[in-house]
């Protein structure tokens, strides 16, 4: 798993993959990685690399996984 994403990685598919990989990490690092994913999602939306609907869907996935 990548420890960080670069600007050209901030797409819907790459962010979704980052979230999926974060969930499969150990329980101690998962919340930190999901927090990073939320930040990356916000940055991608602000930079108009993903749409509002995509950002909302990714944020919803993050919230669901954080509740696990």
Regions found by a protein language model. Give the residues of each.
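Acidic, Ser/Pro/Thr-rich low-complexity regulatory regions
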Residues: 1-68
């Amino acid at each position: 798993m990548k420890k960080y994403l670069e600007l050209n990685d901030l797409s819907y598919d790459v962010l979704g993959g980052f979230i999926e990989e974060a969930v499969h990490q150990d329980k101690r690092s998962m919340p930190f990685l999901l927090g990073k994913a939320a930040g990356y999602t916000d940055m991608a939306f602000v930079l108009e690399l993903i749409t509002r609907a995509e950002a909302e869907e990714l944020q919803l996935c993050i919230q669901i996984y954080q509740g696990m």
